[in-house]
Every structure is written in structure tokens, then in C-alpha cells.
Amino acid sequence: MSPDTVGAVTDRVGPVRSASSRRQADWAPVNTAPSVPAVEPAVAEPVGELIVDWYDGAARDLPWRAPGTDPWAVLVSEVMLQQTPVARVEPVWRAWLARWPTPAALAAASPAEVIRAWGKLGYPRRALRLREAAIAITERHAGVVPADVDELESLPGIGTYTARAVACFGHGQRQPVVDTNVRRVVARLVHGRGEAAAARAADLADIAALAPQDDARAVRFSVAVMELGALVCVAGTPRCGTCPVADRCAWRLSGYPAADGPARRVQKFAGTDRQVRGRLLDVLRAAAEPVEPAALAQAWDDAVQRSRCLDSLLVDGLVVQTDDDRFSLPE
């Protein structure tokens, strides 16, 4: 139940892929950051409770957060929310589950069907990886999404963040779930930094220490702190006046010190290979039969860039070339 990171969004103590309304893709913790003080539980728990109380009154009405949402629906939402805003995900998520309500149903679909249904969510390799995960769930787990984090992480395309998110939000387990939004909240609230450093193993310990002692409240806290980062503790201009823990925020209390290092560059889209790949896939999605190279040439004028992007789509398994040198989605 990943909210978007307010603009890309991603993965389990035991990585929600962007633009502030996007989720960071799954990440692997790195241990190069300097050590930071542990969160004191006596101080941390009231903070966690305050965040849950705030969430109970401020949460967005997102369908994958509804009580009783099954783990498969949660898994689909988490994969879609990586790198894609909530507003674009919701209609596709609903249509996807109406068409493929179980892992077995998706496992039986063709790659072409899956790519077409993915539409314009972006990063379409996620669609193929989700299908591969559905096949693995069907073959290894009798069609039931596993609850164990390690088993989840062994599925194709499922990283640490997604595995913990499914275990927590889909199976109701007490699991620290850390995405870009959560790391930013912890960086400011606990460590007094305006921006989060690179993902690190200590992030999981930080968020676990902040969680309420009650297991059910801890599960709710995991989504509540994401929502706080998505709606209030945002990357650009945080809305500290509406923050439920502003009076305990180390960054605010220290006078909002500026982040170290160069400002982050805004990622452009126009003219990138991502845009070209999308244009080529649009042509193939709309075609009932394999298309001639000339049809793809109409989608993008730059022949060198077009050829490079077409090659990358072939390598990624998103496009196939026929014996007569036409192109189509994989069947």
C-alpha cells in the first residue's frame, strides 16, 4: 500500500521507486553511511502513536489500503506504485485485478496481454516481472502469496521494500517498511537532516524503534509514516504547520539546517530514451499484427536513438522481431 512519494517508488527488520508523487524502486541497504544514535524507545513510542493518530484522521482513501485487501492486490499495488504516481496507478490497478484477480490468473496471461494492460504506467519491465512473480507464486506456493519475507524476496522482481510491504500490509505482520518518504521523515525527525542519505541497514532499525508496541498499531504506523512523508514531510517545502510531531522534530528544533552536498537535479523526460521506448511501445500496443520498421520510424525521427531504444526493448523482452523483420509485443 505504497503511497506515492510526493513527484519517482520501490524494499523489509528482519525498497514504494517518482516527482514527489512517486515511489522509489526496490533498493539494497548499503553500510557506508556513518553510524547514527539509536532511537530511544521511551521517546520514540509516543511519536509513533502521534503519527498513527494523525493518520486516522488524514489518510487518503486509497483502495489498496481498504480493510481486507488481499496480499495479491497489495503486491500488485506495490509494484505499480514504484516510479508511478498514485493518480495514474489507481484506475490501472482496479482494471488489472478485475482481469487477473489471482496470481494464477495472471500467470496464464501472455506477455503481450500484460504489456498492453500496463498501459502508460511507465517502466513496463515491471509488468513482465509481476507476471513472472505470479508464475512463481502459482508454481511454488500453490497460488497463495507467501507471508514470509525471505520467500517473498525470492520471487522475481521482488526486493526488500516490496517483500516487507506485502508482509506488513497484506499479511498484517509487524515489519519495518522503508521507502523514500519514510527515510526522509526519519532523517528529519530523528537525525536532524533535511534530506535522507543513501539507503542503509540502520533505516530499518530506526523505523522499528519508532513503531508502537502494539502489533496492530505497528502495522498501521508503517503506512502512517509513509503517508506523513507523502503529504506533509515532503521533499520540497514541508508542511510543518500541519505535522503531528513538529514539536519533536530534530530538524525543525535545530533551525532547519541546509542539506550538505549539491542540489539534486530534476530528471527530465522529454527527448530521453524512456520517452522513445514509450512511443515505440505505443505503436506496438495499438497494432493487431506485427508492424513494419517504417511504422516505428513515424514514432520518432532520430534514427540512431530510435534504433538504440528498439534494441533495448528487444533485450528487455518487451518486443520481439519476426522472421520477416517486423516487430510486435511478445506472445
Please place each PLM-identified region on the residue numbering.
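Catalytic cores of DNA base-excision repair glycosylases
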Residues: 49-277, 285-294, 299-304
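Short amphipathic alpha-helical interaction segments
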Residues: 300-314
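A short, conserved structural fragment
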Residues: 314-327
